Amino acid sequence: MATFVSNWSTKSVSESFIAPLQKRAEKDVPVGNDVPIIDLQQHHHLLVQQITKACQDFGLFQVINHGFPEELMLETMEVCKEFFALPAEEKEKFKPKGEAAKFELPLEQKAKLYVEGEQLSNEEFLYWKDTLAHGCHPLDQDLVNSWPEKPAKYREVVAKYSVEVRKLTMRMLDYICEGLGLKLGYFDNELSQIQMMLTNYYPPCPDPSSTLGSGGHYDGNLITLLQQDLPGLQQLIVKDATWIAVQPIPTAFVVNLGLTLKVITNEKFEGSIHRVVTDPTRDRVSIATLIGPDYSCTIEPAKELLNQDNPPLYKPYSYSEFADIYLSDKSDYDSGVKPYKINV
């Protein structure tokens, strides 16, 4: 039976967690002082302008003064930390019986715990984390009842958080629409139907130089909002082929654009290639809310953005077919969309 990384007490790293040399993080990664930090309370025109530029240049940015209740952010982080501090037998309830949980389609909406990185069965090494994942929209009672009963406030707090984070995410998507010249609400349909919350726990690691909390990747969905309170997140600056550290800001959200949004914008906007490194002394919890299409969707560049000078860079494809490739083919960051790329 798999052991929770969060319950390990060890002075060495098991061989199964040792990353190949070419996939390991560099020793000294500089803080990315150029990562955009956008104040959502500033003048609307400037706000849209800054978000548009951040989407074009980085595919990742942080937002402050966003109106999300700060107390709710703190409460949610606290109950998530409390969950991972529970005894192993309590967390066992969220592991499928018989075999380790793996990310596969359709993603299970009910709460499931992924341990020892085993969702990456096609990788040659495991990631130093445990992940609690569950759906958050719509919030019907059956779904909420699948969430952890302990900590006692988990369901109440996370339900409130899920509603508020969706409001903020849809607001971000409308700012993106404005920057692209798309009608407001363009994404307020099946393109944003699925909402998953992935809470990642990265325990202290005896040898951070040989392990990863998460390898370099695009998110496959539309957009992700990430709450973090400690360093660990790093982004690849593609044009320079260098990694930078994304410094946490208390009560800020990191906004990651996914591969699906990159395709819909016909590459007007970038996606974010990012990874997570481990720490020798501190444990880290991050809360990621991923919003993306229903699996029945067809994905293609928005027709409103296409013309003779800007032809489509991708042919239409099934989101479920893409997701199968995305989850199974790790040969390149954008392997999931390569079969649909049009050479123009």
UniProtKB/Swiss-Prot annotation:
Binds 1 Fe(2+) ion per subunit. Fe cation binds at H217, D219, H274. One of its GO terms (biological process) is response to molecule of fungal origin. It catalyses: L-hyoscyamine + 2-oxoglutarate + O2 = (6S)-6-hydroxyhyoscyamine + succinate + CO2. Residues 193-293 form the Fe2OG dioxygenase domain. Its cofactor is Fe(2+); L-ascorbate. Keywords: Dioxygenase, Iron, Metal-binding, Oxidoreductase, Vitamin C. Root. The N-terminus is blocked. SUPFAM superfamilies: Clavaminate synthase-like. 2-oxoglutarate binds at R284. It comes from the Eukaryota. Pathway: Alkaloid biosynthesis; scopolamine biosynthesis. Its EC number is 1.14.11.11. One of its GO terms (molecular function) is L-ascorbic acid binding. Belongs to the iron/ascorbate-dependent oxidoreductase family. Monomer. This is Hyoscyamine 6-dioxygenase. It comes from Hyoscyamus niger. The lineage of its organism: Eukaryota, Viridiplantae, Streptophyta, Embryophyta, Tracheophyta. The gene is H6H.
